[in-house]
C-alpha cells in the first residue's frame, strides 16, 4: 500500500467532495470534533467557493492518496491565530473501509515531517477528545507526548468529554 500526501489542486475538488462531504452523516463526522456541529458544504459551495478559497494550494491542507485514490486529508492550523507560534495538526480518513490499516499513521508521520520542514516552530501539537480512541492510539503510536487533558469541556451526545492535547518537539 502506497500512502502519499500532497497539495490539493483544483482538479481534485470534485473527487475530494465525493469522498469527504457527499454523505453528511458519514461515520468520520462522528469522530472529527462532532461537538462543533459543523455543517458540511454542498457540492456547489465546495466546488465554487470553499474548495478554491480554503483548500487549493493551501500549504496547511493536503490530501491523503492511497493507490492513486483520495482517502483523507491532513491539515494544520494556528491555535494562536495571527501570532503563528502554536500549530496543531489534524487528520481525517473518510471511509471506514480505510480505518485500522496503518494509513493514518503513515500519513500523519509524513505530515508532521512536512510541517516541520515549512515552519520554524519548535513544537507541533494535535488535539482530540476522550471519545476518539483511534486518534489517541494514533498519537501514542507516533510517540507524541500527552501534554494536557482538560476535563469535561466537550459536550457530545448528552455527555461531557475531555479535550486531550498531544505534541512533539522538532528535536524529538
Description of each model-found segment:
Residues 1-15, 19, 61-172:
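Acyl-donor (CoA/ACP) binding surface of acyl/acetyltransferases
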Residues 13-21, 43-48:
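An amphipathic alpha-helix signature
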Residues 52-57, 144:
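Short loop/turn motifs at secondary-structure junctions and domain boundaries
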Residues 49-52, 114:
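A generic secondary-structure signal
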Residues 24, 53-54, 119:
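A general structural signal marking secondary-structure boundaries and capping sites
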Residues 25-49:
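Conserved GNAT-fold acetyl-CoA-binding loop/helix
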Amino acid at each position: 500500500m502506497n500512502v502519499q500526501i500532497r497539495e490539493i489542486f483544483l482538479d481534485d475538488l470534485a473527487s475530494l467532495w465525493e469522498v469527504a462531504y457527499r454523505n453528511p452523516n458519514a461515520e468520520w463526522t462522528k469522530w472529527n470534533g462532532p461537538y462543533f456541529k459543523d455543517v458540511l458544504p454542498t457540492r456547489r459551495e465546495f466546488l465554487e467557493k470553499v474548495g478554491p478559497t480554503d483548500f487549493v494550494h493551501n500549504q496547511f491542507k493536503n490530501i491523503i492518496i492511497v493507490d492513486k485514490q483520495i482517502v483523507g486529508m491532513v491539515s494544520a492550523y494556528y491555535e494562536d491565530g495571527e501570532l503563528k507560534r502554536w500549530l496543531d495538526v489534524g487528520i481525517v480518513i473518510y471511509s471506514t473501509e480505510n480505518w485500522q490499516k496503518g494509513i493514518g499513521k503513515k500519513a500523519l508521520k509524513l505530515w508532521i515531517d512536512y510541517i516541520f520542514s515549512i515552519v520554524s516552530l519548535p513544537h507541533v501539537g494535535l488535539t482530540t477528545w476522550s471519545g476518539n480512541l483511534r486518534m489517541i492510539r494514533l498519537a501514542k503510536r507516533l510517540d507524541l507526548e500527552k501534554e494536557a487533558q482538560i476535563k469535561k469541556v466537550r459536550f457530545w451526545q448528552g455527555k461531557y468529554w475531555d479535550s486531550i492535547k498531544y505534541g512533539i518537539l522538532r528535536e524529538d
